[in-house]
Amino acid sequence: FNKNSGERYKRNNSLPEVPTFENYQKLLSELIDRLSTIPKIVLCTLPPIGEHQNSSINQHINKFNDCIKLTAQEKNISLLPVSDSLWDELDKRLYPLRSDYDPNTLPILRRIYGGIIHHYVFKKSWDKVAESKGQWLLFDQIHLGERGAKIIYKLTKNYISSG
């Protein structure tokens, strides 16, 4: 997303270089070419991070989703529109979004571990954890709750059933 996060990701994952959009485009195409012997390949778009469609992180993700869509079209590969389907569901939100994605590590960890505690210790569903934080699909603004998982399940099931 930015230079610092790219450097951190490179270091934490022992990558040879900082991930870039240009490398993503190139490597996605190469990966599909390597998988060409597999009879059926399907790509899916990336889910949002946070639930504000016009946030800078989701604008960044849209760039990658456009690349995924274009690659699927160019290579004649099926596409599961995960992102579009999740945004459609977010339009059905029954309560206002209270806060949105904060890229700082400490707030992310608080949301993740807080969600885990509420789910596993207090036995709240992921959707209830999300609701308690003013979220609809992403209980910690990153990971899907049951509502979001059902959308991806239905997309996948429909794709498998159709062919």
Question: Predicted segment positions?
Answer:
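Alpha-helical cap/lid subdomain in secreted, periplasmic
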Residues: 1-163
